[in-house]
């Protein structure tokens, strides 16, 4: 927990069967945490350890679950919200790559993130369906990982876990267009287009070193994409 600023986080999701009663766990660096369900206060949590607050026997209702953190004087310092996510509506594909581009050096890699989302673009936290990928253009499939036979190594059919997974592709030595398509049962296909950047080569050698283009990060917080 970053103690340089006030933060609050509800562990888990808020999509459960009707009549579910369960504990809710909140991580916060405030002095007290209050839980609200659809605007109604459920009281203050029990402090189990320095950062962990527990709310026992919370009756599930679809909607909005909020944790509000207070300092020692009762002033609000941070809050976090979970909402019930709707039915799966589509796949969302995102490329994560070097800020200076995806280089055609035969070694550069790009991450493909696939998410199952509802109509509002919120990730479906209980979805574990299999996504089928196709790849065309100047890249090679290096795959991802998932629970199952051989952990789906290099498999182009990859299950999501809690609505998300990632796979790697590697550039070829020729710059060009790359098209990735993702399909899953019951959902429309998603398509993503990437373009690799040419790399200067002299006598079979290149002076492009991707590690030199990435800036160091010393700040605290979530890992940046």
Task: Write out the residue ranges for each language-model feature.
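Exposed beta-strand face motif in extracellular beta-rich ectodomains
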Residues: 61-65, 110, 174-178
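Short, well-ordered beta-strand segments
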Residues: 75, 126-147, 155-158, 192-193
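Short beta-strand elements
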Residues: 78-87, 188-210
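Short aromatic-acidic-glycine turn motif
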Residues: 90-93, 133-149, 200-205
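Compositionally biased low-complexity segments at domain edges in trafficked proteins
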Residues: 95-120, 208-225
